[in-house]
């Protein structure tokens, strides 16, 4: 259950309706063909958890999200633009008009036709923007943008952004006839929405939070000039464009300066757009500690922990929990572990690498190929070093939060070696609930390194020899040093929790509102 006890809304924003926009929402629906019943399940991920806390705390907040196909589209069609009240405290359910729930979330679903959504999400948002922003393209061969890609941008990405903007504008006008409201947009799916909303509702307070890395101008030159200009101009419709790190915020301003020719103020971290000033800010996202602990100490988690203890005995646990996304750098992680075991045979039988991996986007060829590489890499390590009594890699392709939190509690080293990562909440989750003074082996390219790097063993994501050495340092670190590092890292995460992440954003918008 998300902790919705967010810091109070600043007085300057009291009475202003709040509209949130994200691609995924807090709940999704399925149709059970056997019973004929409609079932609902909670949305997953750090963004959904964070926004659930905010939406549940604000009585007048409405969360706008996409319904593209299946039962979600059926629910959206039945709602016909009406706001649904959804109780998320137990099994998600839509409340009647007079139904009572504990802090229900108000939801508005945007119907996006399946063909539009496929072009928007399956051609532009993921294979193009995600790859560009994580610098995953092999530029010798990809991307190779043809007329189909251009059509996908115009008829898919632009159209989906228009539909989302129309829903946001309709909600603003319904809740605030004077057009004064707070609109908080999220992530790479909706870069064009800010300017579209600004054109229709010039008096709204608009923020856009980008949850993935923002590279510099050279990376954005992968997009043709008119496409990258649409992206940047869409974001500049907002009052605040926010990122996880100062580095990403500066990179955004450099893009605005070099690709649009606008004058930026790097000291004030802002750019003037006509009569408006647009601010670039860094707000590192965090976790809902209470919700995490609720899962970590559940009956299911306790059973998983007992099973892990029985499996491991006295062995140390090296852990990673990731999606099978190429940006997570999983194959290099196995290569580094292989080198570690080759150079340090004394570790044989003394460590197990549990890799909990959730298969991701298997309809994208690069992702399907990467999952096959992962399986081959894990099998190779086991074949080279395993014995009848000990398998060095325990590969589990599943998503199980109870098991993940049990592994967080039991692990000795957590491996995060991403080539690019906006934040990486796994690092923060593990630090908070771990019971063995774990060592965080953390990529310098993960946003979490800005907060936790001082207490971690830093990894270079492309240097597997360095990663092997770092893993050895982590596994053999002095117990007292482990204890001190872990204690301080946990304090940082508990202090900078999701409530603080939300409150600093609202405080910034409140200051802008007062200055108008």
Model segments located where?
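Catalytic cores of carbohydrate-active enzymes across secretory and cytosolic contexts
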Residues: 2-516
